[in-house]
């Protein structure tokens, strides 16, 4: 075939005409290995830790391992679209999430992208998901209560705004229920909520979102979901995305509540990524920096002073234990990072005591300074009385001959436990809690048969919301937020009246079973 000189010269002439002087500089490397959501890339010598990389087909990755001659990256999309030899480019950016009020009421993925079919999120502002926690001098002490609406928690394990309180227990003990009830109770309290789901079933999250909508909680809540079907890198990123969304509000002077459900699955996702990146395994095959994984996340919860916005982030991380073993690696790590823990017991849960809070190992290290006086004044002995009850109950199983004092302690303890039982999705306000705790403290519940205690608790709330004199006393307590002698005697008299009224409706009621008949006849007079 003869060469056509004219055609060749036309091609060369065309190329000279179209020659551009603009030089596009891009640092790029090539994929050496790819598999299980992790890639090893050669040629990106200047890549930074946490930097975003772009692969073919618009798939992004994040640098998590820097080695001599190669970098390890986790893939944030479908890694099956990437093959060996593909060109990878640096972006010079880190993972960011949209932030702002446009996130309220939305369900987003671990990258802050909407997954609720309600259209795009209309916000121009975004922030890097990884950042250093607020410094010591920017922080303020925890002194304002965060009301959970759960009597057992608000009374004996109080939580303050800016605190980190761990919810820990075996599977199916009501950990998520405690967190969801706390979110529902923030309605009308000017607290924005973020629920971060890590490794949960999508059907479970759909139910949670439906419940939040039903109780009007989605009006102030954002849900960040990295489900069980999502990759380990997305499950790893989800909590950092959640707290970044919350930090924007905190810096604008608002109070935020964030729930991480749960950090056990978060640690498992990080372990999976680390092992695939060939990092040396440590205890329980977790990498050596698994403590830092959670500490840098939970340290971002704080109450900041006015110079830095004056807002707060309160964190409720959830940890799932195996056979109630709180001495395992991840539980002990998170216990040491947080400001206290709420321990949920499977034995109590199976016995129908819900929320199944085991008061013994549960503690709030900073929350007591945030408790309102009305609750603090009447809840001081509650933990001690329950501790005495559990101790005596264990011994009472060995012998039937018990003295009157021991019997009284056991009877009172059993009634306290029934008073603390609370149905899900029915949070209490703090004044109702204070009145219920006063009824416990003044031992007026001793006249009520054990099987009727829960009904009596409901009656207390109804009585103080409807009866004229009782309603006036409740209004005064709401105004003052602390007890005085007049309030104590007035409310005691009203509860005594209620005891007489309530017991009169019970069939075959005999007050002598519970105490002296003369003492009973003096009630309410």
UniProtKB/Swiss-Prot annotation:
- GO molecular function annotation: ADP binding; ATP binding; proton-transporting ATP synthase activity, rotational mechanism
Its topology with respect to the membrane? Peripheral membrane protein
Q: Does the keyword Ion transport apply?
A: yes
Residues marked Required for activity (site): 362
InterPro entries listed in its UniProt record: ATP_synth_asu-like_sf, ATP_synth_asu_C, ATP_synth_asu_C_sf, ATP_synth_F1_a_nt-bd_dom, ATP_synth_F1_asu, ATPase_a/bsu_AS, ATPase_F1/V1/A1_a/bsu_N, ATPase_F1/V1/A1_a/bsu_N_sf
The record's section on PROSITE patterns has: ATPASE_ALPHA_BETA (PS00152)
Write down a Pfam family by its short name: ATP-synt_ab_N
Q: Name the reaction it catalyses.
A: ATP + H2O + 4 H(+)(in) = ADP + phosphate + 5 H(+)(out)
Per the UniProt entry, the Enzyme Commission number(s) are 7.1.2.2
Alphabetized UniProt keyword annotations: ATP synthesis, ATP-binding, Cell membrane, CF(1), Hydrogen ion transport, Ion transport, Membrane, Nucleotide-binding, Translocase, Transport
Report one GO cellular component: plasma membrane
Which residues hold ATP?
169-176
Q: Where in the cell is it found?
A: Cell membrane
Q: Which PANTHER family does the record associate with it?
A: ATP SYNTHASE SUBUNIT ALPHA, MITOCHONDRIAL
The Swiss-Prot or TrEMBL record describes its family as follows: Belongs to the ATPase alpha/beta chains family.
Quaternary organization: F-type ATPases have 2 components, CF(1) - the catalytic core - and CF(0) - the membrane proton channel. CF(1) has five subunits: alpha(3), beta(3), gamma(1), delta(1), epsilon(1). CF(0) has three main subunits: a(1), b(2) and c(9-12). The alpha and beta chains form an alternating ring which encloses part of the gamma chain. CF(1) is attached to CF(0) by a central stalk formed by the gamma and epsilon chains, while a peripheral stalk is formed by the delta and b chains.
Return the HAMAP family for the record: ATP_synth_alpha_bact (MF_01346)
Function per UniProt: Produces ATP from ADP in the presence of a proton gradient across the membrane. The alpha chain is a regulatory subunit.
Name recorded for this polypeptide: ATP synthase subunit alpha
Q: What is the protein's species of origin? A: Mesoplasma florum (strain ATCC 33453 / NBRC 100688 / NCTC 11704 / L1) (Acholeplasma florum)
What gene, per UniProt, encodes this protein?
atpA
